[in-house]
Swiss-Prot record:
GO MF assignments: ATP binding; sulfate adenylyltransferase (ATP) activity
PANTHER family per the UniProt record, alphabetical: SULFATE ADENYLYLTRANSFERASE SUBUNIT 2 (PTHR43196:SF1)
Protein's recorded name: Sulfate adenylyltransferase subunit 2
Protein family membership: Belongs to the PAPS reductase family. CysD subfamily.
Pathway assigned in UniProt: Sulfur metabolism; hydrogen sulfide biosynthesis; sulfite from sulfate: step 1/3
Assembly, per entry: Heterodimer composed of CysD, the smaller subunit, and CysN.
E.C. code: 2.7.7.4
Job of this protein: With CysN forms the ATP sulfurylase (ATPS) that catalyzes the adenylation of sulfate producing adenosine 5'-phosphosulfate (APS) and diphosphate, the first enzymatic step in sulfur assimilation pathway. APS synthesis involves the formation of a high-energy phosphoric-sulfuric acid anhydride bond driven by GTP hydrolysis by CysN coupled to ATP hydrolysis by CysD.
Gene3D superfamilies reported in the protein's UniProt record: HUPs
């Protein structure tokens, strides 16, 4: 008996929708790429892509825009995943930004993010001439992402115009682009944070250990717990790292990512904690709080 849509669980419906989108992009575009930020959403998106083309190899590479300030655990996890699954991994860093010493301490989160993330991403997309790029953004994360299409059109400068988006009826997507233009594709658009965690649990998906609670060295700044991940962390006068049981709901560059105090060190405990949470997972991402509407402005400039 065929399993009709109304007999599928909501997670299986989401899975089927995402796999359809991933296969559609692989068939429709000449040179797609999957952006790999190493977080939980990237882990789910990669898992779905591997499912979509199993037992064949992924028909597109993964791209990680490395700022040089990611958690050590993230880089180790990235390299291990590439080795385990054998996918093509492109690691790109803004060479000019690195040589200029751009960092989150001296230059602030806004300028640092623009140069090392946004400009770095645009450099990589131009260098390899990708015409479609998968991203792991979800509509429930943040208000600017809530109004973005699954197929998000970008012009030749990689800019997004929220007032000029293409209609998407049912499961029909318009991927037509001219030379130099591209599409950002978000297969997880309709997933929620809870969906992501439940799917990780049910599918036994590997994720970075930072998502699980452990005793880690942190300093508190403006109510945010920042983990001291290496010797480059600049401590303020009189500031001493404290060992606390913390975990991360979202991952980014370690000087700009806040931890939460938690004892949740298993997936069921994380899911239970998430159900009781009253704040967004991106509350710990300092780049989201640069100014009002900062995420939408970043996306208009070419950010993920």
């Amino acid at each position: 008996m065929l399993m009709t849509e109304d007999r599928l669980t909501h997670l299986k419906q989401l899975e089927a929708e995402s796999i359809h989108i991933i296969r559609e992009v692989a068939a429709e575009f000449e040179n797609p790429v999957m952006l790999y930020s190493i977080g939980k959403d990237s882990a789910v998106m990669l898992h779905l892509a591997l499912k979509a083309f199993y037992p064949a190899k992924l028909p597109f590479p993964l791209l990680h825009v490395d700022t040089g300030w990611k958690f050590k655990d993230m880089i180790a996890f990235r390299d291990n995943m590439a080795k385990t699954h054998g996918f093509d991994l492109i690691v790109h860093q803004n060479k000019e930004g690195r040589e200029a010493g751009i960092n989150p301490f001296d230059h602030g989160s806004s300028k640092y993010t623009d140069i090392m993330k946004t400009q770095g991403l645009k450099q990589a997309l131009d260098k390899y001439q990708f015409d479609a790029a998968f991203g792991g953004a979800r509509r429930d994360e943040e208000k600017s992402r809530a109004k973005e299409r699954v197929y998000s059109f970008r012009d030749t400068k990689h800019r997004w115009d929220p007032k000029n988006q293409r209609p998407e009826l049912w499961s029909l997507y318009n991927g037509k682009v001219n030379k130099g233009e591209s599409i950002r594709v978000f297969p997880l658009s309709n997933w929620t944070e809870l969906d992501i965690w439940q799917y990780i649990y049910l599918e036994n998906i590997q994720i970075v250990p930072l998502y699980f609670s452990a005793v880690r060295p942190v300093v508190e700044r403006s109510g945010t717990l920042i983990m001291v991940d290496d010797e480059r962390m600049r401590l303020k006068e009189g500031e001493v790292p404290q060992m606390k049981s913390v975990r991360f709901r979202t991952l980014g560059c370690y000087p700009l990512t806040g931890a939460v105090e938690s004892e949740a060190d298993t997936l069921p405990e994380i899911i239970q904690e998430m159900l009781l949470a009253t704040s967004s997972e991106r509350q710990g991402r300092m780049i989201d709080h640069d100014e009002a509407g900062s995420m939408e402005k970043k996306k208009q400039e070419g950010y993920f």
